[in-house]
Amino acid sequence: MQWVGLLAVSLPGVAALAALLFTWRQVGQTSIELRISEQGQITNRYNAAINNLGSQSIDVRLGGMYALQRIMQDSTRDHPTVVSVLSAYVRQHAPLPASGANKSQATSEGKSPDADIQAVINVLAHRRPAFDKGTTVDLSRTDLSGLKSMGTGTINFREADLTGADLRGADLSNADLSLASLFGANLTQATLLGTNLRGAHLNNAILTKTSVCGTDTFTDPETGKATYFCPDLTSADLGEAKLNGASLAHTKLTGAYLTHADLTDADLTGADLTDADLTDADLRNANFTGARLRGVTLNGAKVEGARGLPSSSR
């Protein structure tokens, strides 16, 4: 009987297929169980780290912070939560004093954040922002005066909220602060060498005597010219900012908004102010020698004693 023969021939294949399907289901089930187990381990690690943040011991708290950093590296799903937790830690443990010291232009010489605050800032600075998933690093109204260098590599605070933060004497060298909110922040005597502030919002910010450019130069590989280590303030909003006495020599301020800004006694030698808006700005005794001023708007600006401005502005 032909069908009996066909059945006999097909049975081994059917059995093999059944075995394959069973194995596939087992592998799938094992994979699901493994993911559940891994997620459970991360949850346990997260809970332990959070508990450590509440410890009285600085060493235990630091351990908790670095444990959260490892969780960010191991779990992209938990990355945004960790960013929010660490940001909240800074806001809770380093708030502005009730006196509102961020409005003062006094220096913060000798002052620096506690070790745990510095550590949290370092962790946030070196996270992978691609996994933030819309979460903002919210350090608004915090006291970060005297913040030390955050090391080498990528220092990313792009689009961070630093509204009203006290950053007097902070070292923000080479940090990416593009599109960051720095409304009313105090950056008196802060170091901004090589900082990217492109499109940042600095309305009412205080940058008195801020170190913006270094005295050293490097050779630009594209142009072959000597270039200063200066921040990029292209299109930055500096409306009503206090920049009196600031060292802004060779700074890129292309298209920047400086309406009503206080630039008295500021050094802007060699700065690029192409298409910048300086309407109603106070430019008295500022030095614009060698600055690029094509397309700059100076309507209503106070220019008494300013050097390097076109005669038509007087």
Where are these predicted regions, by residue range?
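Hydrophobic core/packing positions within alpha-helical solenoid repeats
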Residues: 68, 86, 117, 121-124
